[in-house]
UniProtKB/Swiss-Prot annotation:
This protein's name: RNA polymerase-associated protein RapA
Known EC number: 3.6.4.-
Keyword terms of this UniProt record: Activator, ATP-binding, DNA-binding, Helicase, Hydrolase, Nucleotide-binding, Transcription, Transcription regulation
Top enzyme class: hydrolase
Occurrences of domain Helicase ATP-binding (ranges): 163-337
Binding site for ATP: D176, E177, V178, G179, L180, G181, K182, T183
Species of the source: Histophilus somni (strain 129Pt)
GO molecular function terms attached to this record: ATP binding; DNA binding; helicase activity; hydrolase activity, acting on acid anhydrides
Gene behind this protein: rapA
InterPro entries per the UniProt record, alphabetical: Helicase_ATP-bd (IPR014001), Helicase_C-like (IPR001650), Helicase_RapA (IPR023949), P-loop_NTPase (IPR027417), RapA_C (IPR022737), SNF2-like_sf (IPR038718), SNF2/RAD54-like_C (IPR049730), SNF2_N (IPR000330)
Organismal lineage: Bacteria, Pseudomonadati, Pseudomonadota, Gammaproteobacteria, Pasteurellales
Length: 966
């Protein structure tokens, strides 16, 4: 390819970008600007997916100023085209440089391919039409961005994702209780925003220990490839010799890094602030300490980032756990103008308390007192609620009262103090969780361990934490010793595994080496099939271990994991958990149990803790169980109590005496009960209703389940693979291996690895086996497959034989598919209202459109393929008639195309105006409606209608049909 600045090219893979201009090139790359969509692309010279745009004599062009002209002659100078044209409005002849051509232009000439005998197979034309129809449907689907995640269909998660994901620059606090899936909610919101092109650049800040968990979750659940940033990676961008420091944060669009690292590296923090991100996600945001006088450095950094990044998601503990002051600090990060003073916030919250009590009465279906009705009238106008209150307090039937209560609750939710900013679900509110059953196994400490402890104690070589791991102390004496040959925990574990032959068992150890040694013990002693899973393994190796464990037949019965290695992995298909070592704080304990105790777990969880008598292990287990009840219930107050009692607990764990330990446990238990009671009293039922979505959320889950059960995606995708030339191998168990081949119609299938990939269309199987790709309409392989067809030349022109005894032999029909589309900047989401829409015409020899009488499928059933030689002869003979029909189709398409564009404008106006009016109404009673949100929507409405006015249409594909008697 010869490139020159000023040349006009189009992208083969992204037709919607419009007509591009070469703006720069070097030895390896070429830069091209697409003014129509306000985009710039940089391609490798050797493989740029670009097509040179050169018009020929007789072609019609459009100037940037809007006038049209016909090309009279073409001249080339220095690789640039100069067109002598005749304007269509005044017949003036003028020379136009190619740089002056209109940017909003469509290029696709199936007739050129047809007349040059580049004829596609009939099935390719059918695939193209189906791909266009599916593309249109998916752009307009309300389930887009919600159905493609490797996650169960949990109503409250889907509700939050839909509610927040459709907003412009959402700024919210996700504060669900542990185990309810805040990470999944954040991922679903992120995916919706990315698919809608509302955001492109994303920064996720997490604690250092959770970086890989987020990396795995984003990749495995959402097919999002994030980059992990640390000092080593960023140092590669520092080049003192150039005297110019490149900003590493602009090198990638999707970035995960540790918040602590940014705090410790002011230079990197400054670079992140200059990174021009669209969305910021902060996990464990409750660790950002704040007070009015001295906010922490971490808090101030997040404050600075949230000031320059439009969309912000904070994942945090529940407000009740945080306390009001800390809760205010998170809200201040999201909207400092609204939450400017803690005292004002406190006063507002106190005013809301009576309303919360009235809500409780409504939920309990009690008759509201006069005082409660007055409190509700303070939040809603009396005239708004009076009709509803009359029904609620009357002798109306139960159904009428239920409707009135529902309407009143809906109004209250919209006007709730922090309803649009805060989402918080509790296990009690969501329900559907299994029980957790604790089994303590008390064993005698082997003399080998006791002797090793005594000797190393005398030498002063034991640190307190090591007392929890006697096998490691023993190995200090003799590194080659096989401790598992005499450790009674190993024999107990083997007996447990043998007694649960049909069950899967997850065993969590503190470290990788113990997991590896236990695998050896199970294999050598009893030949038990097991897999190991730890932080020293690559993601692919962990996937394989996870898949081996998930297999029902011939799979591993036991998975032996280190505590860090299992982060981010959920094994809901198992219900037996062995804690070979106990974590040293309640949050880590909950993380371990959370591998099995997730929403969607269908069976009670059996938790086994083998401990040695009279050791720190058993005392810690006792404190967890009797003090916190942390094994059998989630313990949201665990971290608070551990911080409060930690020093005293450590004393009891490391001393030989256990005097007063029982009293200490009892004291912890009393504090736990008190905190639990306070949390329950502080529950905001109205907020919970807003957060879980009620019946609408359930309907959303049902809609996705119905689509999951449809075979439409499977039929289309397998047909797509067949035609493209992707190899398919059915493995049974609802999974297939797809691999690229050397005979594919395209040189590369985006998203399909060279070594192939195993895929499934079944959600339950995808949840059980993380090594499988879960194919949905939102999956990159499916989306890329559709793009390959609709943006390429496959199926653009075809010839077919119509077998019909009623028609004279040689009767000509021409089937044409036009695309109605609008070119617009990312983020405007015009595809909601006007996606690339196929409009089918079926013309007879007289130019009559028969498409309304004869459907695509109905016609297809009567068609037979025509050989290439015969098709070439038919085209040659019938070319004049075909050319005449193509001209006629350009007239036929005008009215229906204009109607579709008008409908899109009406839909855009109605949809955006309704949302603007709703926000204006809410703003009058709810201060959390940000003025800039309404302003953005109004600008969006104006620009959307303007660009829809400029929508146009183009001929995408055509099929010549000739009749025969047989």
């Amino acid at each position: 390819m010869l490139f020159a600045i000023g040349q006009r090219w189009i992208s083969e893979s992204e037709n919607s970008l419009g007509l591009g201009i070469i703006t720069g090139q070097d030895n390896r790359t070429v830069t091209i600007s697409f003014p129509a969509s306000d985009e710039t692309r940089i391609y490798a010279l050797a493989s740029a997916p670009l097509t040179r745009v050169l018009f020929q004599k007789g072609d019609e062009i459009t100037h940037q100023l809007g006038w049209k002209a016909r090309v009279v002659d073409v001249m080339m100078r220095n690789e640039l085209a100069f067109y002598l044209v005749q304007r269509l409005d005044n017949n003036e002849e003028i020379v136009v440089q190619e740089m002056e051509l209109a940017h909003q232009i469509s290029f696709s000439k199936p007739q050129d391919r047809l007349f040059s005998t580049q004829i596609d197979r009939n099935e390719h034309f059918v695939l193209r039409y189906k791909a266009l129809k599916h593309q249109q449907e998916q752009f307009q689907s309300s389930l887009r961005g919600l159905r493609g995640n490797r996650a169960g269909l949990i109503p409250h998660q889907l509700h939050i994702a839909q509610e927040v994901g459709r907003r412009i620059a959402p700024r919210v606090l996700l504060a669900d209780e542990v185990g309810l899936g805040k990470t999944i909610e954040a991922g679903m919101i992120l995916q919706q925003q990315l698919l809608a092109e509302k955001v492109q650049r994303v920064l996720i800040l997490v604690p250092e220990t959770l970086q890989h968990q987020w990396l795995v979750e984003m990749l495995r659940r959402f097919n999002l490839h994030f980059s992990l940033f640390d000092e080593e990676r960023c140092a590669d961008f520092d080049n003192p010799e150039d005297h110019v420091e490149a900003n590493p944060f602009v090198a990638e669009n999707l970035i995960i890094c540790a918040l602590d690292w940014l705090v410790q590296q002011p230079k990197r923090a400054k670079q992140a602030l200059a990174g021009e991100f669209d969305l910021l996600i902060v996990d464990e945001a409750h660790h950002l300490t704040w007070s009015e006088d001295s906010p922490s450095i971490a808090y101030e950094l997040v404050m600075q980032l949230s000031a320059v990044i439009p969309a912000v998601l904070l994942l945090t503990a529940t407000p009740e756990q945080l306390g009001q002051q800390s809760h205010f600090a998170r809200l201040h990060l999201l909207d400092p103008n609204r939450f400017y003073s803690y005292r004002a916030f406190e006063k507002e919250q106190q005013q809301y308390q009576p309303v919360a009590k009235a809500v409780q009465s409504l939920l309990s279906e009690h008759i509201l007192t006069v005082e409660e009705q007055n409190h509700l009238a303070e939040l809603l106008s009396e005239q708004d609620i009076e009709p509803m209150l009359k029904v609620i307090n009357s002798q109306a039937d139960t159904e009428q009262k239920q409707v009135a209560r529902g309407e009143l609750m809906s109004n209250l939710i919209d006007r709730h103090g922090t309803g649009r900013l805060l989402f918080r679900n509790t296990r009690q509110g969501v329900q559907g969780f299994p029980h957790r059953i604790y089994h303590q196994i008390k064993l005698d400490l082997p003399t080998q361990y006791q002797n090793a402890i005594n000797v190393l104690n005398m030498l002063g070589e034991i640190k307190d934490p090591e007392l929890f791991y006697p096998e490691q102390i023993f190995q200090k004496m003799n590194a080659d010793a096989t401790w598992w040959r005499f450790d009674p925990r190993v024999d107990w574990l083997i007996n447990l595994v043998k007694s649960l032959r049909e069950e899967k068992i997850l065993v969590i150890c503190q470290d990788a080496i113990t997991a590896i040694q236990l695998e050896q013990a199970l294999r050598e002693k009893e030949g038990i099939r097991s897999a190991v899973f730890h932080e020293n393994m690559s993601i692919i190796e962990r996937d394989r271990a996870s898949a081996y464990f998930a297999q029902q037949e011939e799979g591993a019965q036991v998975l032996l994991s280190s505590s860090i290695g299992s982060e981010g992995r959920n094994f809901q298909f198992a219900c037996h958990l062995v804690l070979f070592h106990l974590p040293n704080n309640p949050d880590l304990l909950e993380q371990c149990i959370g591998r099995l105790d997730r929403i969607g777990q269908r069976r009670d969880i059996q938790i086994y803790v083998p401990c040695f008598a009279d050791t720190p292990q058993i005392r810690l287990a006792q404190w967890y169980h009797e003090g916190l009840n942390a094994f059998e219930e989630t313990c949201p107050m665990g971290a608070i109590l551990h911080e409060k009692c930690g020093a005293k607990l450590t004393e009891f764990l490391t001393s030989d005496t256990t005097d007063d330990f029982q009293a200490f446990i009892q004291q912890t238990h009393q504090q736990q009960l008190q905190l639990k009671s306070e949390l329950e009293q502080g529950r905001d039922r109205l907020l919970e209703l807003n957060s879980n979505g009620g019946e609408q959320a359930q309907q959303l889950a049902n809609d996705i389940a119905i689509q999951d059960g449809s075979t439409e995606l499977i039929d289309f995708t397998l047909n797509l693979f067949d035609i493209i030339g992707v190899e398919q191998e059915d493995l049974g168990e609802k999974s297939i291996v797809i691999s690229p081949t050397g005979t594919m119609l395209v040189p590369d299938f985006p998203g399909l690895k060279e070594e192939g990939v195993t895929v499934t269309f079944d959600r339950d199987l995808a949840l059980a086996r993380e090594d499988l790709e879960f194919l949905t309409w939102d999956h990159p392989i499916v989306r890329n497959g559709i793009d390959l067809i609709v943006s390429g030349d496959i199926g653009k022109s075809a010839v077919a034989l119509l077998v019909n005894k009623q028609l004279p032999t040689g009767t000509l029909l021409l089937e044409l598919v036009y695309i109605i589309e609008s070119q617009s900047p990312r983020g405007l989401q015009l595809t909601r209202f006007l996606p690339p829409t196929p409009l089918r015409l079926l013309l007879d020899i007289k130019g009559n459109d028969l498409s309304h009488q004869i459907s695509f499928q109905g016609l297809q059933k009567q068609l037979k393929p025509m050989g290439k030689n015969m098709a070439t002869k038919v085209i040659k003979i019938m070319r004049p008639a075909i050319e005449q029909l193509i001209k006629q189709s350009a007239k036929n398409v005008v009215e229906p195309a204009k109607m579709i564009i008008e409908q899109a404008k009406q839909l855009a106006d109605q949809s955006l105006s309704a949302e603007i009016n709703r926000l204006y109404a809410l703003q009058a009673v709810n201060k959390n409606i940000r003025p800039e949100e309404i302003e953005q929507l109004e600008s969006q409405r104006t620009l959307s209608l303007e660009l829809l006015n400029q929508a146009n249409w183009r001929l995408d594909s055509l099929r010549v049909i000739v009749s025969n008697k047989e």
